[in-house]
């Protein structure tokens, strides 16, 4: 069988959604790869090199910053030289040597209205170009939910047999030790008395819902991590600082995020579009209640274990909502693990490899 070479460019970026997924899957492929069928090819300017036992790591002489040279020239050139197959985790595959590719969602294709500035429009054009190329020319497509799979099929008219669902997981959270210093740093945050959410610059994360809700409920406290304001267009978002019941935490570590999730009244994730949505899964793993948007993706993943809100309507009472009963999260936490995802991916890759 041919060797499968993984595009390690994700190691040059911060560990957010796709990057976290990529790293956790690689760690588990390393455990499964007893026959050295996989290799990780990384740019010279990686932020760190993971400790792997079986999965070979090769460091390139080139940096990632020469975008898009790495994805379309440097990486595929190495793959061709090794007479191997490429595996890309980040919504693209080489223009000239397409391989196996993960398309996590097709947000840029479906929500053009969210890309308003010239730079954003250019980025959207490139993303849509990559979606189309990867889906039409890639040897096989992987995505993270049945919802995303169906959207890809409907939008690009691709055969369902060409797409395999490999979901996200939460088990990386087990090795993170919570750091409650963040609670001491913000005296407004009393245990089980505040709501928590992750700030983001992406419009689809829908912080506008939380702003409107907070205005209507000054008695409730809301903690928001990350850079929730910079780069946003909406006047509602810019008003975050003026609301006394919103606590802007700034950057928080993974350890502090875990502490906030564990000690909040509920974790809120009001996105109006997601391909999967990992943070609510992380919150469930530490026993937190989760309030998520009533959208197809979340209904698929979280089923009856979540409290649902209309992402377009903040006229709800969260305290009353949280008094209702939801199902135990045990079954979905047992299912959505990176261990399970990596095993499914490994077996699928072996089968594909035998046919190429």
PLM feature spans:
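Carbohydrate transferase catalytic cores enriched for Leloir-type hexosyltransferases
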Residues: 1-356
């Amino acid at each position: 069988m041919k060797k499968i070479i993984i595009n390690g460019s994700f190691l040059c970026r911060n560990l957010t959604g796709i990057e976290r997924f990529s790293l956790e899957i690689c760690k588990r492929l390393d455990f499964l790869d007893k026959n050295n069928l996989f290799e990780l090819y990384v740019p010279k300017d990686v932020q760190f090199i993971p400790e792997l036992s079986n999965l070979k790591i090769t460091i390139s002489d080139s940096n990632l910053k020469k975008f898009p040279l790495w994805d379309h020239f440097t990486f595929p050139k190495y793959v061709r030289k090794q007479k191997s197959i490429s595996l890309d985790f980040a919504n693209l595959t080489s223009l000239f040597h397409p391989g196996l590719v993960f398309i996590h969602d097709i947000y840029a294709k479906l929500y053009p209205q969210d890309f308003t500035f010239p730079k954003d429009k250019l980025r959207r054009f490139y993303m849509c170009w990559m979606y189309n190329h990867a889906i039409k020319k890639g040897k096989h497509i992987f995505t993270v939910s049945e919802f995303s799979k169906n959207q890809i099929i409907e939008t690009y008219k691709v055969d369902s047999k060409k797409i395999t669902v490999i979901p996200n997981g939460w088990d990386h959270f087990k090795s993170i030790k919570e750091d409650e210093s963040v609670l001491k740093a913000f005296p407004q945050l009393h245990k089980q008395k505040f709501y928590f959410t992750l700030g983001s610059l992406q419009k689809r994360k829908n912080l506008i819902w939380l702003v409107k809700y907070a205005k209507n409920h000054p008695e409730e406290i809301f903690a928001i991590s990350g850079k929730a304001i910079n780069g946003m267009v909406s006047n509602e978002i810019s008003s975050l600082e003026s609301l006394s019941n919103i606590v802007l935490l700034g950057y928080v570590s993974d350890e502090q995020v875990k502490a906030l999730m564990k000690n909040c009244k509920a974790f809120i994730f009001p996105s109006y579009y997601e391909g999967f949505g990992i943070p609510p899964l992380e919150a469930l793993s530490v026993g937190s209640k989760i309030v998520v948007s009533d959208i197809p993706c979340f209904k698929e993943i979280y089923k009856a274990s979540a409290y649902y809100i209309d992402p377009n309507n903040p006229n709800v009472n969260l305290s009353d909502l949280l008094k209702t009963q939801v199902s135990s999260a045990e079954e979905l936490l047992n299912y959505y693990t990176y261990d399970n995802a990596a095993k499914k991916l490994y077996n699928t890759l072996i089968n594909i490899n035998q046919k190429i």
